């Protein structure tokens, strides 16, 4: 059946025991005039996306399986070092001015309100998932040379049935050359957003994600805003999502601005990135200088979990090192800035000693 040359043509046909609709549209889109997303992203639901359109990863490996981001012990450590600052978690969002609301409470009511605020903060601090980048889709279904040159535009055919998960949704593209292929991930994301709009997401990515605009955002210490927009706009296993997150983490590490993400849902992902890259020195020094030695110890423990064959993990195991001693072992073995870490620890211990003497 030949496609009718109209902006939107619909076909209905019987497919098995259910009715399905396939939609054919020209693969063109107009860029939205707005530059930034106006809607604040909602708390991210953690879950592994289904990838039935890409080739399955090989299961089973002769190597010892390393801890994954969603492992219970990993999540416990990352949640612990993230911290819980209610003032920061519930900081005012940029929105139209409204008169403040004041309430008179008894002590019991205040304690209950605080408890509810803590529970709400834990929901807001739920970490977005960290996934491997999805494999590209390069499946060609047919080469119809007889159609070559009959059209100058691509046509996208989409199954818009409501009972199909988006990862399983059948979407194909007819090229002007006559090639019929499966849509790429980027094409799928755009088309799905057209027919099934997601709040806070656009069909075309905002210009804020261009490198020159990201540098401006970083210079204004708006790293958390960039990551919030990124979570709203992209799928967690997309190349752009991973790229923006890594760029943001590297800028924070370069300038030592770890506090910008502390007590946000992005701190755990940042710590996980540094541990995987064996670049925890800067974060470790920052934690020690902020009197967060317990968090620094947890960070080194996580490092040893991911790199159990390293010299630091081996020596810590032999010495049964704990607490500050665990950090010292790391500083003497695998740290890139070991002298700075030892100096920070020395300063911390001197302060603790002076406080103990004063009391």
From Swiss-Prot:
It is found in: Mitochondrion. Keywords: Acetylation, Mitochondrion, Phosphoprotein, Ribonucleoprotein, Ribosomal protein. Belongs to the mitochondrion-specific ribosomal protein mS22 family. Component of the mitochondrial ribosome small subunit (28S) which comprises a 12S rRNA and about 30 distinct proteins. Disruption phenotype: Heterozygous MRPS22 knockout mice are fertile and show no overt abnormalities. Homozygous MRPS22 knockout results in embryonic lethality. The modification N6-acetyllysine is found at residue 210. Residues 40-65 are annotated as: Disordered. GO terms for cellular component: mitochondrial inner membrane; mitochondrial small ribosomal subunit; mitochondrion. One of its GO terms (molecular function) is structural constituent of ribosome. This is Small ribosomal subunit protein mS22. The modification Phosphoserine is found at residue 54. It comes from Mus musculus (Mouse). GO terms for biological process: mitochondrial translation. Pfam families: MRP-S22. PANTHER family: MITOCHONDRIAL 28S RIBOSOMAL PROTEIN S22, SMALL RIBOSOMAL SUBUNIT PROTEIN MS22. The gene is Mrps22.
